[in-house]
């Protein structure tokens, strides 16, 4: 029950409910076998909390569950900073510094994660990059859609200047030159990234 989960693993009532929803009646058993499930999706509890539960169960600091969880956590943390992947060597070094375990042990855990498709690897210029599967799928989907847009013929913005003048007159203000350029590109380019700035 949620009460047992709360008491055993020292987590708040809301998280206990989420644990029970995620793992069902076998939650206690699943977390006892692998406390690091708590810091993965969808719960994302603090890694150190999972560490303390693992210590309660006398799990070693270099156990497979901890090594694999450290790799996943490192990738998720970097995804939060805008990185969809990391070079293999950088991932191993970062995870090694995080849990104070040698990169060689993490390399074996990484190979297992790739084998079980928990993580994905792609080569770019001879360098292996490691991805979380959902981020690789998203990146490939975006690349595919951009390729489709790039193949389309460009639009011609007929009478754009005249239409802009009419718009300015009816709305009672004039667009700045950069704003006019942004509108022109939005009307003629197949794909446009408009970054923030004054007037956007």
Language-model features and meaning:
Residues 1-200:
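Conserved ATP-binding/catalytic motifs of P-loop helicase motor domains
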């Amino acid at each position: 029950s949620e009460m047992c989960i709360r008491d055993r693993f020292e987590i708040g009532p809301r998280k206990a409910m989420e644990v029970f929803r995620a793992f069902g009646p076998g939650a206690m058993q699943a977390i006892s076998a692998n406390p690091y499930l708590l810091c993965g999706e969808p719960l994302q509890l603090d890694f150190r909390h999972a560490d303390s539960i693992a210590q309660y169960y006398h799990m070693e600091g270099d156990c497979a569950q901890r090594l694999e969880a450290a790799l996943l956590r490192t990738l998720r943390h970097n995804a939060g900073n805008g990185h969809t992947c990391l070079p293999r060597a950088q991932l191993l070094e970062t995870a090694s510094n995080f849990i104070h375990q040698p990169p060689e042990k993490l390399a074996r855990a990484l190979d297992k994660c790739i084998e079980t498709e928990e993580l994905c690897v792609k080569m770019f210029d001879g360098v292996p990059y490691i991805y979380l599967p959902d981020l690789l799928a998203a990146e490939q989907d975006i690349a595919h859609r951009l390729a489709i847009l790039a193949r389309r013929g460009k639009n011609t913005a007929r009478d754009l200047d005249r239409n802009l003048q009419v718009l300015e007159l009816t709305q009672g203000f004039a667009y700045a030159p950069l704003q006019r350029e942004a509108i022109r590109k939005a009307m003629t380019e197949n794909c446009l990234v408009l970054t923030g700035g004054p007037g956007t």
